[in-house]
């Protein structure tokens, strides 16, 4: 049946781990991203004692740390650089942009830190029933997890660990210093060139942003077009713009060996 949680006011003794058999929490959340924080907010509304365990990425998860926030920020930075050197009006002569790549990345990092603080940590900072813990959780049994050598018991568990980058099994890939979105967005030194494997929405976002910031970009895609999940007219329009901006597109290419 549906799980039943005890009701009680925030901070009330009815939900205190100390009053549970073995000091159990009402809810243990494994993960620290948007789903985990949404669950923590709901649990606080219900007056549940909650433990949030987060390992890997900082609190806030993929979106704020290595996903939507940094990618859209860099897209906007690239857009500003592009419009500083391109005009659709004959009477307007753009003078170009002086791009400080390192400063762009540092500004991105500041934005990430600010949003992590204001949109996640500050939201739960005054929660009376929530305990946040950094570390990796391992299940010892159906009611117990171990974090950093200590055991914690829970009546219910929510696994909200998100996703990780799928690394393709390409021969020799593990022997080179390849990048994923996790590591690419941290680079403060501008690379001379960038080869992107895959022309989905993540690959095309990165390609457009970094190309406009002065990086020579090539995309390899094993299907016939970019954004294969969209209709062909969208792909054609985007491909035309990308080629006009100097991005090299290689459809029907599959990396097999490094």
Describe each region flagged by the PLM.
Residues 188-230:
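Rossmann-like NAD(P)H-binding beta-loop-alpha module
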